């Protein structure tokens, strides 16, 4: 006769002991996952703070490098355009008469403007003389036209020297010429045009390449709208000029190593 087996009796755990067991064994199984979650959370928080600090430092550095001086005269906004630079144009043509006519037609005083005194102060423009015929307006010369003036002075001196003209120059003229060289150098360094110019080992470099430029027509329009009506011949209050005399430069035959191409 088969012997009946009695089920084994499991010991009854005290509720407190059951809780202790769960605490010991159950929590030990969950602990790795909890630690991973905590680690990942701390890692995300750390990265967020780090990237935030880097962004703040970068922004602060950019703002510091672009800090505008309080005495910076805010210039009028002039549109940007792309133009080709040519090695030889009408302004450097081998036709000397054409060269002279073009250069002598330039009216640098077209860049003399008159604007409202109060408005100029709002743009941080420096104090200046008043327009004789209208004391409410302040007189300024646009930088680009000052450079045009200096180029004219230097070219006139070069032409006279090449022609063997006998002339004696005053100390003021010497100082003016030195100033123009200096001014053009400062302007060139200020613009720091980094356009890479092609070269094949000859004299000519970069002819026909595109450059990023300010729109001269837009600058001329601004000068027209705010003209001080100043000319070298009649001074202020004279007849306003019909323009600055500049014409668009177009490519012409080019001289390479002593030969016209």
Curated annotation (Swiss-Prot):
<keyword id="KW-0325">Glycoprotein</keyword>
<comment type="similarity">
    <text>Belongs to the ustYa family.</text>
</comment>
<feature type="short sequence motif" description="HXXHC 2">
    <location>
        <begin position="176"/>
        <end position="180"/>
    </location>
</feature>
<dbReference type="Pfam" id="PF11807">
    <property type="entry name" value="UstYa"/>
</dbReference>
<dbReference type="GO" id="GO:0016020">
    <property type="term" value="C:membrane"/>
</dbReference>
<protein>
    <recommendedName>
        <fullName>Hydroxylase cctR</fullName>
        <ecNumber>1.-.-.-</ecNumber>
    </recommendedName>
</protein>
<dbReference type="InterPro" id="IPR021765">
    <property type="entry name" value="UstYa-like"/>
</dbReference>
<dbReference type="GO" id="GO:0043386">
    <property type="term" value="P:mycotoxin biosynthetic process"/>
</dbReference>
<keyword id="KW-0472">Membrane</keyword>
<keyword id="KW-1133">Transmembrane helix</keyword>
<keyword id="KW-0560">Oxidoreductase</keyword>
<feature type="glycosylation site" description="N-linked (GlcNAc...) asparagine">
    <location>
        <position position="95"/>
    </location>
</feature>
<dbReference type="GO" id="GO:0016491">
    <property type="term" value="F:oxidoreductase activity"/>
</dbReference>
<feature type="short sequence motif" description="HXXHC 1">
    <location>
        <begin position="146"/>
        <end position="150"/>
    </location>
</feature>
<keyword id="KW-0812">Transmembrane</keyword>
<comment type="pathway">
    <text>Mycotoxin biosynthesis.</text>
</comment>
<comment type="function">
    <text>Hydroxylase; part of the gene cluster that mediates the biosynthesis of the mycotoxin cyclochlorotine, a hepatotoxic and carcinogenic cyclic chlorinated pentapeptide. Within the pathway, cctR performs the last step by hydroxylating cyclochlorotine to yield hydroxycyclochlorotine. The NRPS cctN initially catalyzes the condensation of L-serine (Ser), Pro, L-2-aminobutyrate (2Abu), Ser, and beta-Phe in this order to produce isocyclotine.</text>
</comment>
<feature type="transmembrane region" description="Helical">
    <location>
        <begin position="38"/>
        <end position="58"/>
    </location>
</feature>
